[in-house]
């Protein structure tokens, strides 16, 4: 079976599957009882095609708009521009001077002419009653007016499905419809023959069973939909920095309004259409909106920023002009939201299993019906009544047909693929409580197969709460942890050096020191920037004073490829100076001078270089992150087109930043090792720092290899083949090094790789990995969008929790499949053999519907929602090549099926003698006993299925309230069916002895299951 599944249903990958692969497996699933329900959690490929068409249209539209705006720019200044634009009265009364349609046409149409008519960005700022310095007012009344005129920043979504819609979808089941038709005919014929109410019992029994199945199914599906709705709401929680009422603050992107001033940096997604106000080196990736991969430069000359695009480089301030469904992104997202998520490989595989078993079931159903009809025909031939059909015989034919249809109901395990969704929804909800947000359903199951985790250091293995604890300035290396130590340090070095140091810290930064609510000083920026700015303040520096004394004219933001950040500032008397900071060795290599202990600039000779490198090594060996700060005197002239100097710098000094290892990381790494998962650290930090942290975390062992990115890049494929299995630390790595490592692990070594990332440049590695894990706190929006799981607390221990839940999902589905296939096999064979040998089916349509509900909806609820056990992380991972239906499962399925078949067959052949049954009701009593024993076999088999290999199946059973509730409901309802609903279910009340025998024979399946688990089989 596994080879058939891999061949026909193996094209669908955990991520990035082609539409052709998604389409192909659907065509193979031709035995589907209820397409609406079966394919509810699969991608809507037609909606995706529609979204792609919108992208292509956008690409052409914006290309034309850019060409037109470029042509207009050549003569726009020479024209006397006038506008025929008429301001709507309601907009004027609200206090604004431009309407939303006019605003939208400016940015979407890249219309420089209209922008010029309205006075440029400054003119629009006034017309929107806002200010670049202060932003909009936060007064509730004013915000309400703004929302009323310009709309809110939300796109139209499909309305939530109500419970009754799920009931309607459950009723679309073809087999249930056929059974309903049978029930209707049975009602009519029965009432005509036997009158009301006796003649209606059979028909009403089937109707009641159908309604019960429908309502239980709808309730389960509705609960799942609510869980997914909660998860979708979590995915959409994105915040952005804005200025409102002169205060820099964070708000949800859905609260943005036209007139807001938004602060954007590398990796941010642009949350609305807007105009560039000011910024440096801004490159925008518009591929998500237009499909165009080439980044677009944005500046005062080309100021248009489109919602949904991403900041690839640089930083800027933006004026929001258009929000929500007025933007092209809003329209695209409204379409994409209906496209749905890709189905997971496990869902597809189980659709394959359902299809195979469905075909077998259909074959058995047809044969069973044919055998039953043949038996009736033979009887009529013996009676010589070929052409005379009584009402009883017609009812028998109808019952045979209903039994055949119900065999299909039981045989087509529609619940298999849906159990995956149920289990994933349950796991995802629980993982949210454990600080992990799953964006891609498949990641949940794939994480259970992970064999390697490539983890960042900063913020994942460490706390990301950084402080400067050591510094070497003017040849003096001292501890500077705390304001007192920092002030003492500052007093011991020349004032000129302190001034240069503060200028470097406060001007060459992506952070900012602002006054927040309640006049509290607040530092905004990355943890590294925050640590440096805090150090600057503790040295007695004044951020605003230093910033106002110079003018920043060019910025090259930090990125993980260059490993440095640079600015050019203009000082009084038109003198230009460049400041640079970054990875210590890299920045130091670009220096040829340094500041000595007297504050003088002197050449950086071999002795001084060696001294500084020793300081870097010393700091790094103490697990400190080291940064080098340097400056370069440019002179009186600097062109904005010119690059920031790359060499000839003067070293100001080295700082050592403490970033402590997170509590519990060492234990989590040990858990990974015991689970057969290799943890590798991939960091941009210094090799010595990386090794110190890796040893502290338990990642780097005595026989492990630590290497730098540049050296890794130089290795040949043959060398990498020997190196990678022992590689535990990669330092000074670029994002492409991480991408290469992930690719080689997946292709060369067939590993299932999980990788963490936080920066924009990590997107390729996150995309390449089997499971991309983005950091929720330090991660950029670009990284989060490329990831499959967002680690909300940036903690490595949470990654281990995700792996544990992933394994739990995989094993829970295996348990459910094992349980369901056992019921399938027994129900099919019992009815088929009985029909062939006795001419009767012991399990009626109503009884089979109840069995179907036990094994389908209730079974999935019980087994697919088992919480993970700690010993899950003591097993080896399944890996890339593991079979889903393992040898262990086949052993359990076949052994348990054989036991149940032997019991039921003995009852059918010897049951009357064994129980002393005679009289007119003996057949009914025997069939009731068979039905009762069959159900109790499934109840106890459900308990046995909690563990596929362990004998102790009761561990933690009382903690799983869902499991206990399902078992209790099953037993209670079974008693009601036997004792009270016999008229409808074709059963008769049993005496105490018969009940005890039913329970004992069902229970004996557990020792049988335990004995089976002692039979050794290969794991796959």
Swiss-Prot record:
Tissue: Expressed at higher levels in roots than in leaves.
Regulation of its function: Activated by calmodulin.
N-acetylmethionine sites (modified residues): 1
Localization annotation: Plastid, Chloroplast inner membrane
Membrane association type: Multi-pass membrane protein
Claim: Translocase is one of the keywords in the record: yes
Function noted in UniProt: This magnesium-dependent enzyme catalyzes the hydrolysis of ATP coupled with the translocation of calcium from the cytosol out of the cell or into organelles.
Protein name: Calcium-transporting ATPase 1
Source organism: Arabidopsis thaliana
């Amino acid at each position: 079976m596994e080879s058939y599944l891999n061949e026909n249903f193996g094209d669908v990958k955990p991520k990035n599957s082609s539409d052709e692969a998604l389409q192909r497996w659907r065509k193979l699933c031709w035995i589907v009882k209820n397409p609406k329900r079966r394919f509810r959690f699969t991608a809507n490929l037609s909606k995706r095609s529609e979204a792609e068409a919108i992208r292509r249209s956008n690409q052409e539209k914006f290309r034309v708009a850019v060409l037109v705006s470029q042509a207009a720019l050549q003569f726009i200044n020479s024209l006397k521009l006038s506008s025929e634009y008429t301001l709507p009265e309601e907009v004027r009364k609200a206090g604004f001077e431009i309407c939303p349609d006019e605003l939208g046409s400016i940015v979407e149409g890249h219309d420089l002419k209209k922008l010029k008519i309205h006075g440029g960005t400054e003119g629009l700022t006034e017309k929107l009653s806002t200010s670049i310095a202060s932003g909009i007012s936060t007064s509730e009344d004013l915000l309400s007016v703004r929302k009323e005129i310009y709309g809110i920043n939300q796109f139209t979504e499909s309305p939530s499905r109500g419970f009754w819609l799920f009931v309607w979808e459950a009723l679309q089941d073809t087999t249930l419809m056929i059974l309903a038709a049978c029930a209707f005919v049975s009602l009519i014929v029965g009432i005509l023959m036997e009158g009301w109410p006796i003649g209606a019992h059979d028909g009403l029994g089937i109707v009641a069973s159908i309604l019960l199945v429908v309502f239980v199914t709808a309730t389960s599906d509705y609960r799942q939909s609510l869980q997914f709705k909660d998860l979708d709401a979590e995915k959409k929680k994105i915040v952005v920095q804005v200025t409102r009422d002169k205060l820099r603050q964070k708000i949800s992107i859905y609260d943005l309004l036209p007139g807001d001033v938004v602060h954007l940096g590398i990796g941010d997604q642009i949350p609305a259409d807007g105009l560039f106000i000011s910024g440096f080196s801004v490159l925008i990736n518009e591929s998500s909106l237009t499909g165009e991969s080439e980044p677009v430069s944005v500046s005062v000359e080309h100021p248009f920023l489109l919602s949904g695009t991403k900041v690839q480089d640089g930083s800027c301030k933006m004026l929001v002009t258009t929000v929500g469904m007025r933007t092209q992104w809003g329209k695209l997202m409204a379409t994409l939201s209906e496209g749905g998520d890709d189905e997971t490989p496990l869902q597809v595989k189980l659709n394959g299993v359902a299809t195979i078993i469905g075909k077998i079931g259909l074959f058995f159903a047809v044969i069973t019906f044919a055998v039953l009809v043949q038996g009736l025909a033979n009887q009529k031939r013996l009676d010589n009544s070929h052409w005379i059909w009584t009402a009883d015989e017609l009812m028998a034919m109808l019952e045979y047909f209903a039994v055949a249809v119900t065999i299909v109901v039981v045989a087509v395990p529609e619940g298999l693929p849906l159990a995956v969704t149920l289990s994933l929804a349950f796991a995802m909800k629980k993982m949210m409580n454990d600080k992990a947000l799953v964006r891609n359903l498949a990641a949940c199951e794939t994480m259970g197969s992970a064999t390697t985790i490539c983890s960042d250091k900063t913020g994942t293995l460490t706390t990301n709460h950084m402080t400067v604890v050591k510094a070497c300035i003017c040849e003096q290396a001292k501890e500077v942890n705390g304001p007192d130590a920092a002030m003492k340090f500052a007093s011991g070095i020349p004032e000129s050096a302190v001034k240069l140091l503060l200028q470097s810290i406060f001007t060459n930064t992506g952070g900012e020191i602002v006054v927040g609510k309640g006049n509290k000083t607040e530092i905004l920026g990355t943890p590294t920037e925050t640590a440096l700015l805090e150090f600057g303040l503790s040295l007695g520096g004044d951020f605003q004073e230093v910033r106002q004394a110079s003018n920043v004219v060019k910025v090259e933001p930090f990125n993980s490829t260059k490993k440095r950040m640079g600015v050019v500032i203009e000082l009084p008397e038109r003198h230009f100076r460049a400041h640079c900071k970054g990875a210590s060795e890299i920045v130091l290599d670009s220096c040829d001078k340094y500041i000595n202990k007297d504050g003088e600039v002197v050449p950086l000779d071999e002795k001084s270089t060696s001294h500084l490198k020793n300081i870097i090594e010393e700091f790094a060996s103490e697990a400190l992150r080291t940064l080098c700060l340097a400056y370069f005197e440019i002179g009186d002239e600097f062109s904005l087109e010119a690059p920031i100097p790359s060499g000839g710098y003067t070293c100001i000094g080295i700082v050592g930043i403490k970033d402590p290892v997170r509590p519990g990381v060492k234990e989590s790494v040990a858990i990974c090792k015991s689970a057969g998962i290799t943890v590798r650290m991939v960091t941009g930090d210094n090799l010595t720092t990386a090794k110190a942290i890796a040893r502290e975390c338990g990642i780097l062992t005595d026989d492990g290899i630590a290497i730098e990115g540049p050296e890794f890049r130089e290795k040949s494929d043959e060398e990498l083949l020997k190196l990678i299995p022992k590689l535990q630390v990669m330092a000074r790595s670029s994002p492409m090094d991480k991408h290469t490592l992930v690719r080689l692990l997946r292709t060369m070594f067939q590993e299932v790789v999980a990788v963490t990332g936080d920066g924009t440049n990590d997107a390729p590695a996150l995309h390449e990995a089997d499971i991309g894990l983005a950091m929720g706190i330090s991660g950029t929006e670009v990284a989060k969008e490329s990831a499959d799981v967002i680690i909300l607390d940036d903690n490595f221990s949470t990654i281990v929790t995700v792996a544990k839940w992933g394994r739990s999902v995989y094993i829970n589905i295996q348990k459910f499949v094992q349980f369901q296939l056992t019921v399938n096999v027994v129900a099919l064979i019992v009815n088929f053999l009985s029909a062939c040998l006795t001419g009767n089916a012991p399990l009626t349509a109503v009884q089979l519907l109840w069995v179907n509900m036990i094994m389908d909806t209730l079974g999935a609820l019980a087994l697919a929602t088992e919480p993970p056990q700690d010993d899950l992380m003591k097993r080896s991972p399944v890996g890339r090549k593991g079979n889903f239906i393992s040898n262990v499962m086949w052993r359990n399925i076949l052994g348990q099926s054989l036991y149940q078949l032997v019991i039921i067959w003995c009852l059918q052949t010897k049951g009357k003698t064994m129980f002393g049954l005679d009289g007119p009701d003996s057949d009914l009593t025997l069939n009731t006993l068979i039905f009762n024993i069959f159900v109790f076999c499934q109840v106890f088999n459900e308990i046995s299925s909690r563990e596929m290999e362990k004998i102790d199946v009761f561990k933690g059973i009382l903690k799983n309230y869902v499991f206990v509730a399902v078992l209790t409901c099953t037993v209670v309802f079974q008693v009601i069916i036997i004792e009270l609903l016999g008229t409808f279910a074709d059963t008769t009340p049993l005496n105490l002895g018969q009940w005890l025998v039913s329970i004992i024979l069902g229970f004996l399946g557990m020792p049988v299951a335990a004995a089976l688990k002692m039979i050794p089989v290969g794991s796959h």
